[in-house]
């Protein structure tokens, strides 16, 4: 059985040390491919000659956790099919340019047991631009369901901080409802942005991970939620995007219809959940905008 020792990894429940800056280069093609990969149709994000062409705010989400110094003897990694996105938080401080270089630094902030034989690991990341300005703040929560097989992690005591929190939606009809169809090649396109986990394309890997068929990337679901909210509440104006947080409650599959139910929660803030049929797939979620 694999063993986690987060008490040693995170003494006194303090965050771990920041890793070295990781230099990341990207270009216009990467920006366009990401937008198409999360199903965006608005030309301001998918056509480079559009007068308002810009980076969709959640573009850097895949950099979450990059370079975090994690002692694998204390917090062992899981193979792709057993390591899935559980929660994500992204805050836009300054828009990214449509191409160039940024630096990402990350650190481990928490590791806690999650059910029988599983671990929930959280990292914090900051993205800075060529001027040294902070552009993006992120927290990445991953659900490690084993190191060699499903549920093979020994019971352990959690340590560190957690951004995970329960957020209940109101018991009334939503103020806004919007939806999107997940096309049958959506995962094939999204993976070209750099997430090559076989869980999302290989039926055998999906079965190893406990699913009957490949599932949509959690970060693709995340992107769909963000683009639906920006369209419904901000007229697709990326400058109005502030922050978004989600928990992935259940997997989304190709050809599913993703429905967002949105409730106002004060000026510039909404609570939301996403469902496929009667199944809630995104919960404990909010979006803030100006």
Where do the PLM segments sit?
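Hydrophobic, proline/glycine-rich low-complexity stretches
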Residues: 1-103
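A generic structural micro-feature
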Residues: 82, 117-119, 238
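Residue-level recognition of well-ordered secondary-structure positions
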Residues: 35, 39, 59-60, 107, ...
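Catalytic-pocket segment enriched in acidic/His residues
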Residues: 204-269, 274-280, 290
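HotDog/MaoC-like acyl-thioester-processing domains
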Residues: 2-13, 86-177, 252-255, 259-290
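Solvent-exposed, flexible loop/coil residues
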Residues: 14, 28, 49, 63-65, ...
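A contiguous, surface-exposed recognition patch within enzymatic or periplasmic domains that forms
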Residues: 2-48, 158-221, 228-231
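Hydrophobic residues on conserved beta-strands that form the core of alpha/beta folds
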Residues: 34, 137, 241-243
């Amino acid at each position: 059985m694999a063993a986690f020792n987060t008490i040693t990894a995170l003494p006194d429940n303090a965050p771990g040390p920041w890793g070295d800056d990781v230099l990341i280069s990207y270009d216009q093609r990467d920006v366009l491919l990401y937008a198409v990969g999360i199903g965006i149709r608005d030309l301001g994000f998918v056509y480079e000659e559009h007068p308002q062409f810009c980076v969709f705010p959640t573009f850097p989400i895949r950099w979450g956790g990059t370079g975090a110094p994690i002692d694998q003897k204390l917090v062992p990694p899981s193979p792709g099919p057993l390591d899935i996105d559980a929660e994500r938080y992204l805050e836009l401080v300054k828009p990214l340019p449509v191409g160039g270089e940024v630096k990402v630094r990350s650190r481990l902030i928490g590791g806690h047991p999650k059910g029988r034989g599983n671990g929930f690991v959280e990292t914090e990341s900051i993205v800075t631009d060529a001027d040294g300005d902070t552009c993006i703040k992120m927290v990445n929560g991953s659900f490690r369901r084993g190191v060699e097989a499903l549920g093979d992690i020994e019971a352990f005591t959690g340590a560190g901080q957690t951004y995970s929190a329960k957020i209940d939606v109101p018991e009334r009809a939503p103020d806004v409802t919007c939806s999107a169809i997940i096309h049958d090649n959506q995962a094939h396109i999204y993976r070209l942005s750099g997430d090559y986990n076989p869980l999302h394309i290989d039926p055998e890997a999906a079965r190893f991970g406990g699913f009957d068929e490949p599932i949509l990337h959690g970060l693709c679901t995340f992107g769909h939620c963000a683009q639906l909210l920006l369209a419904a509440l901000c007229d697709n104006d990326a400058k109005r995007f502030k922050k978004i947080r989600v928990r992935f409650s259940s997997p989304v599959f190709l050809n599913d219809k993703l429905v967002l139910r949105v409730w106002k929660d004060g000026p510039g803030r909404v609570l939301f959940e996403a469902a496929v049929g009667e199944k809630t797939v995104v919960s404990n979620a909010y979006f803030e905008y100006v």
